[in-house]
């Protein structure tokens, strides 16, 4: 039978139909589709999406470590280092002056503006008293100013410096000041002093003397006491004897202020020692050289230490410097030989007493007054 005969064609079609029916029976099978099995658990579940489920990481696998949280470090506050503050020459607080002044190179008594003074920026009561030749306490009392002696710019003060007598070297002194005070101390500046015609004499600090409760700045090497010579045109410059007459009771006798060796003698030349220095031990007694009244007891100035000044009469004063302990107070009456202090080394480099005698404000050699020993 040829391939193109009708019988062959029918047979072929029938065979193909049987194959199609068989295939259709396979697709209509009642067996459910194979389940999708989870990799990790093995349990079955149906899915309609046909998407693969990504399994979680297996136990024992090293997970990616999360970044560790670093502790927050707070900045450590370093202690502030205190820097030295340069003292400003002038500070103003509520219109008032707060001013710390060094008097080392400021001439005293140089004001010649009359009996009043107008406060300027930078002034203090101490400074005004200094340049007008007054004691700051008297000046405060005269102008009703109480401690701490605050001033206002433009304030007018009564300084009592009506005469305004100039002194060679830029210093000045008035008779009003001379009548009020009579304390004399040391200096290393040379000048000519005009002496007021009053029984009590006061000299400017720049010329080797000072008003009550004031001392000169330290212009001398440590351990050396220096006082510039003073020329007083209105009084005799010849050194008097201890028995010289005076307008007040004469001093009958002088006595040594302490025991010990004289280690520095009086020097009359310019820049020389205007007293004597006596060596001793700390705590050694120092006594008044004669009867008198204490007009100064303090330590307001570097280089002189604890200083006591005694006024014996209108002409004579004695000074005791570098004391360790002062046993008297200002305005106290003392007797010759009375213990007034103990020896020390305040304001100097070694234990000693610097002792001076002044006659009408002029330094004289204490050895000419003290008894021989």
Swiss-Prot record:
The keyword RNA-binding does not apply. Residues 30-70 are annotated as: Disordered. GO terms for biological process: cell division. A lipid is attached at residue 26 (S-diacylglycerol cysteine). A lipid is attached at residue 26 (N-palmitoyl cysteine). The keyword Flavoprotein does not apply. It comes from the Bacteria. SUPFAM superfamilies: Duplicated hybrid motif. Sequence repeats lie at residues 199-205, 221-227, 233-239, 240-246. Residues 115-159 form the LysM domain. InterPro entries: Cell_wall_metabolism_enzyme, Dup_hybrid_motif, LysM_dom, LysM_dom_sf, Peptidase_M23. Keywords: Cell cycle, Cell division, Cell inner membrane, Cell membrane, Lipoprotein, Membrane, Palmitate, Repeat, Signal. GO terms for molecular function: metalloendopeptidase activity. One of its GO terms (cellular component) is cell division site. Belongs to the E.coli NlpD/Haemophilus LppB family. Activator of the cell wall hydrolase AmiC. Required for septal murein cleavage and daughter cell separation during cell division. This is Murein hydrolase activator NlpD. It comes from Salmonella typhi.
């Amino acid at each position: 039978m040829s391939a193109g005969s009708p019988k062959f064609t029918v047979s072929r079609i029938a065979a193909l139909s049987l194959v199609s029916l068989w295939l259709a029976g396979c697709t209509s099978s009642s067996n459910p589709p194979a389940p999708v099995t989870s990799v990790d658990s093995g349990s079955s579940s149906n899915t309609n999406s046909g998407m693969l489920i990504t399994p979680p990481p297996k136990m024992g696998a090293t997970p990616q470590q999360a970044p560790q949280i670093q502790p927050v470090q707070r900045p450590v506050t370093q202690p502030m280092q205190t820097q030295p503050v340069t003292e400003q020459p002038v500070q103003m607080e509520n219109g008032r002056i707060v001013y710390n002044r060094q008097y080392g190179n400021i001439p005293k008594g140089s004001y010649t503006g009359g009996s009043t003074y107008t406060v300027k920026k930078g002034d203090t009561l101490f400074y005004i008293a200094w340049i007008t030749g007054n004691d700051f306490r008297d000046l405060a009392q005269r102008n009703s100013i109480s401690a701490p002696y605050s001033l206002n710019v433009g304030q007018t003060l009564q300084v009592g410096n009506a005469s305004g007598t100039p002194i060679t070297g830029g210093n000045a002194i008035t008779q009003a000041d001379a009548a009020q005070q009579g304390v004399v101390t040391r200096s290393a500046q040379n000048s000519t002093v005009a002496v007021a015609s009053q029984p009590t004499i006061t000299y400017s600090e720049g010329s080797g003397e000072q008003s009550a409760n004031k001392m000169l700045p330290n212009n001398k090497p440590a351990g050396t006491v220096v006082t510039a010579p003073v020329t007083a045109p209105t009084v005799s410059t010849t050194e008097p004897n201890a028995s010289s007459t005076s307008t007040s009771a004469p001093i009958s006798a002088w006595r040594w202020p302490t025991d010990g060796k004289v280690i520095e003698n009086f020097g009359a030349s310019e820049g020389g020692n205007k007293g004597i220095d006596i060596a001793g031990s700390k705590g050694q007694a120092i006594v008044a050289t004669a009867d008198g009244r204490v007009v100064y007891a303090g330590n307001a100035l570097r280089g002189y230490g604890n200083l006591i000044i005694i006024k014996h009469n209108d002409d004579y004063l004695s000074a005791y410097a570098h004391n360790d302990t002062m046993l008297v107070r200002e305005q106290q009456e003392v007797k010759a030989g009375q213990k007034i202090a103990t020896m020390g080394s305040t304001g100097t480099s070694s234990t000693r007493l610097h002792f001076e005698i002044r006659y009408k404000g002029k330094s004289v050699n204490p050895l000419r007054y003290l008894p021989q020993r």
